Amino acid sequence: MFALSKSLRQIKRQTIQYRFISGISKDEVYCIIDTIKSSHEWHKLKQDQKMQAYVAEALTNPTSENVSELMQLKRKMMRTLNENYNLALGYIEEGLPGPIERLKFRSEFLRVVDSEHYAYFSKSLDHIRYCKGLDRATRRKEFYNCIELHRRCNPEVTEGSGILLPDDIHQWFFVFVPPDERMKHYLFLIENNVLISGHYAGLTQERMLKGSEMEYRVASFLHFIEDPEKRHIFDEKFSVMHPFRPMRRIVNLLITKKDMVHIKEYLDVLTTRLENVELRNERIPYDVRKLYFIEFMHTLQHFARCTNYIDMFLETVHSMMDALPKDTPVPFIRKSFVEILNYFQRIGDTETVFKIMSMFNEYPLTEPNTKFTNEMLGRILFSLRQFKDPKLTASYIVIAYKSIKTKKMLNNLGLWCLIFGNGFGRLNKKAIRDAKQPEKFINLNVPESLRFKRAPDSVALNELYIVVFDYYKSKLSPDEYRELVVKCYKYYCDFLKNHVNTYLQWRIDTSILRTMIHRAKFDIKDDRLAYEMLMNFYAMNLNPRFDSKNTPFGLVLYRNEAINQQEFNQVLELMQRCRAPMDHKIIITIVLKFIKSGNIDLAHEWYTRLLKTGYPLRHFKMIEEAKRLNWDIPEPAERYYEECERKNQLEEENFDDIYLQNPAEDSYTNDLIEAAKKIGRIYATSIGARIIPENDKAAMELNQKKNAYGT
C-alpha cells in the first residue's frame, strides 16, 4: 500500500514537471533558449514555431498554471541570457501573431515592474478597446485576459497594491456589461484586486450598492465577511481594492441601512486606511488631506447620529487623534471637531462633549493661548450651562483662566461674593488678592492645554452671567430677581467704565449687554428697562464691537410697546452712529411700527428693502398687513400664508430666544454683511433725511409736512 502511494506521488510530480502548453514542454523551450545562446542566432526566436506557440498560448489563456510556466521561462531567460535578454525579447515579440499579444508580452517580460511596465499594460488595454473587428463579448474577454495575466504575472505587486485600471476602461465596462452580468463582472474585479478608483469605477460601485440585495452584499463585501469560508476575501482584498472615498461610501451606506453587525471592522479598516495612506502621503496636497479628515469625521458624526454606540465612536476618534502626525497644525482638525461638538451640544449630550474635550489633555497639537483653545474653552462653558450651577461654571473659569486678574474681575463685577460668598457685593483689594479658595469652590481637572494665563474674555463671562440668571430666576422672587439683573448691569457698566484699560476697550463687545437686555425683556417682561439699559450703555461711549448677527438694537425694538415713536427713532439713530448691522427682524419691526403710526409710504419703502435682502418672508402678521395694503407678496410667502390659514394656525415668527446664540460662535456671516450692505442706504436716506434735529427749523417744517414719524 505504501509502495503504491509513493508511486502515485512520483507520477504526479512527473506530470507537473512535464506539463505541456500547446503540446510543448518547458524543457523544450529551455533547450531552444540554450541553443540560441550558443549560436547567437537570435533571429531564429522570431521564426521558432514551438517558442511562439508556447508563449502565445500562455498569453491568450492566462491560467495560473500557464502563467507560472511563462514566468519560469522569463526567469530562465534572464539568468541565461544576461545582457542579451532584451535582444531575445525583441525577436520573440516580433514573431507573436498580433499586436495585443505583443503588448502583453512586452509588458510582462520587462525586467523591472515600474512605470514603463504599467504604461505597456495600459497600452494593451487601450489597444483592446479600440481594436476593430471585435464584438463586445470578445472585447470583454480580451480585457479580462489582459487583467488576469497582469495579476498572475505580478502577484507581489497586485496582491498588496491592487491593479489600477484607466478610467476609460471602467467606462467601457460600465456602459457595455449587460445588467445580468454586472455581479459576475464585479466578482471578477474583486478576484483580481482591481482598484475601485476613478469616476466610472465609483459609478460601477454605486450602481452595485443600489442594485439587488445580492449586488449590494457583494459590493459592500458583506457577502464575504459574514461567511467564515469567505472571510479571508474581506481580510485580503477589501482594504487593497478601496481607496478612502469608495471605502467611506460603503461605511456610510452600512450606517444608513443600520447594518451594524460588522461596523466596527469596517470603521477600523477605514481609520487605518486614512491614518496610513491619505494623511501620511505628502504628495497629496495639504488641503486635500484636510478634506479627507473632515469627510472621515463626517462619517463618524453620521455614525453617532444613527446609533447609540458612543463608546465605539469615541474609541475611533481617539485612535485617529493618536495617529495624527505630531506636527499637524491646529486648523487641520478645527472644523471637524467644531462640527462634532456642535452636534452633541445641540442634542444635549454633555457627557460626550466632555469626553471629547478630555482627549485634548493628551493631544499635543493644541497649545495654550491659541484661537482653537479659546474656542474649545467657550464650548466647555456652553456645555456647563445646562447644569445651571454658578459655582461649577465660575470654578471652571477661575481654573482655566489662571490669573489673579480673574478673581479681581469677578470681584469687581460683584459675582465673586454672589457665587462663593453670601450675597451680591465686593471684597476689598487685599481680601480678594489673599483669598483662599472658598468652601463652595469646586476643584476641576482642567487640561493644561486648555488653560490661559490671562483674565477671561466676554465669551466666558457671558456664559457665567447666563448660568447666574438661570439659577437665581428659580430661587428668587420676581422683584428680587429684577433687582439682581439691575445690579449685575450696573456693576458691569461700572467695571467697563472704571476698570478696563483705555487701550483694551476695543475688545468690548455686546454679548453680555444682549444677555442682560434679554433677561429684562423676556424674564422680567420690562421692555422699558431693556430700552434704558441700551441707551445708558451707549451713553458711556465705549464703541463696542458687534460680534454677532443679532445686535442689541433689534432685541430692544422688537415688539416693544413701552417706547414712543421718538424713542424708537433714537434707537434707529444710535444704530446709524454705531453702523450696526440690520437684520430682517429689525426691518419687520420698523415696517409694522410705521404701519401702526399711519406712515404707509415709509412702511412700504422699508418693506421693499426687506424683500430686496432675499429674506424668505414667513411672518404671518407682516404678510397679512402686506395683503391688506395690496403690496407685492413673493409667491413662497403667499403659499406660507395660505398654509397657515388652512391649518388655522396664525403663526408669527418667534424671535424671543434667537438673540441668545452660542457665544463661542459669535461672528458675522458673509451673507448678513452683504444683506446689511444692500440696505445700507437707509442711513443716508430714511434716517438721515427724516430724523429731525431739535434746533433745525427747516427740518421741523419738513416733518410737519410729511408727518414722517407722527410723534
UniProtKB/Swiss-Prot annotation:
Membrane topology: Peripheral membrane protein
Transit peptide endpoints, chain numbering: 1-28
InterPro entries assigned to the protein according to its UniProt record, in alphabetical order: Atp22
Localization of this protein: Mitochondrion inner membrane
Any one annotated GO CC term: mitochondrial inner membrane
Coarse class of the protein's main subcellular location: mitochondrion
Signal peptide span: none
Keyword Membrane belongs to the record: yes
Keywords: Membrane, Mitochondrion, Mitochondrion inner membrane, Transit peptide, Translation regulation
Membrane found in the keyword field: yes
GO MF assignments: translation regulator activity
Family (UniProt): Belongs to the ATP22 family.
Function (record text): Translation factor specific for subunit 6 of the mitochondrial ATPase. Required for assembly of the CF(0) component of the ATPase.
Protein name, entry field: Mitochondrial translation factor ATP22
